[in-house]
């Protein structure tokens, strides 16, 4: 598995261009809005302003930031869009029908910084192009949103994949991992130039799970790209809306397919509960910072 500290990067960046792009990627399961909250859970109307403040803080001064979310039903997507302001927009559809039904896995970006060149939604099933399809032993439809962006001022490209694996079906999780490995490969080149492909999401698996290991055999966990002294915060990403750490798990991850040329800065699992004792979500956001070459020519194949 590709878990070691691999420091590609600084030399490759310097030879291609003295300029780099300061990147921040986030993945965050925001917990879908429900009519009646469970133990420890506040309603979305209470959590929403806290989450908006957190997101605005984490993206402030980082124009190239890309943020992906899970469990966002359409009204929540609209709330995030409104809370982040006019400088942001998003790409993504509902998993039930490929339109507005069911949970989204949206990717938010600033269109003044990134131009959306291509995007697609695939269902994690034997028929990935069939909206609403349920794969293998999954309990629900599951999707991955994929988007390729071009940096407006430099032409550099990056692809981001946002997904949410099934919480019941182990076969579905393993097969979904194989599907995403293949998709990451398909999205890894453009006009004979390679580009970094990132995968963020709530995978509902810990690192000892075969589904995680399938991803780690072909991609790199961003956490392990960053030296330990530059990792911050929690290890566990799911809290179940409780303060008891015994039921916390590490199930939210960010992977990268090809880290060559990237200079890794920091990794963090952020807090979601403060003095007001309100959980913003039952998941903690995962954030990785890195620098990437600002010229597309830096990653020419051959």
What spans do the regions from the language model cover?
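Short catalytic/ligand-binding loop motif for oxyanion handling, primarily in non-cytosolic enzymes
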Residues: 33-36, 75-78, 98-106, 117, ...
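Metal-dependent phosphoester-hydrolase catalytic domains
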Residues: 171, 185-198, 204-302
């Amino acid at each position: 598995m590709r878990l070691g500290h691999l420091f590609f990067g600084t030399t490759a960046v310097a030879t291609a261009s003295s300029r780099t792009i300061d990147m921040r990627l986030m993945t965050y399961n925001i917990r879908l809005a429900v009519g009646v909250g469970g133990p420890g859970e506040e309603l979305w109307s209470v959590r929403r302003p806290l989450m908006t403040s957190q997101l605005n803080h984490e993206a402030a001064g980082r124009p190239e930031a890309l943020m992906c979310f899970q469990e966002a039903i359409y009204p929540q997507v609209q709330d995030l869009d409104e809370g982040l302001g006019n400088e942001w927009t998003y790409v993504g559809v509902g998993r039930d029908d490929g339109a507005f039904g069911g949970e989204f896995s949206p990717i938010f970006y600033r269109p003044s910084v990134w131009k959306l060149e291509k995007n697609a939604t695939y269902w994690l099933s034997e028929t990935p192009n069939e909206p609403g399809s349920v794969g293998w032993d999954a309990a629900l439809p599951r999707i991955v949103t994929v988007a390729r962006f071009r940096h407006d001022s430099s032409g550099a490209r990056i692809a981001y994949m946002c997904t949410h694996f099934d919480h019941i079906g182990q076969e579905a999780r393993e097969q979904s991992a194989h599907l995403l490995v293949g998709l990451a490969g398909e999205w890894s080149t453009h006009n004979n130039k390679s580009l970094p492909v990132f995968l963020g999401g709530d995978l509902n698996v810990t690192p000892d799970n075969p589904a995680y290991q399938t991803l780690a055999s072909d991609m790199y966990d961003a956490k392990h790209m960053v030296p330990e002294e530059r990792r911050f915060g929690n290890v566990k990403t799911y809290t179940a809306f409780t303060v008891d750490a015994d039921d916390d798990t590490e199930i939210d991850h960010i992977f990268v397919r090809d880290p060559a040329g990237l200079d890794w800065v920091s990794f963090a699992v952020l807090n979601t509960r403060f003095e007001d004792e309100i959980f913003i979500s039952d998941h903690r956001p995962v954030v990785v910072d890195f620098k990437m070459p600002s010229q597309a020519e830096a990653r020419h194949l051959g």
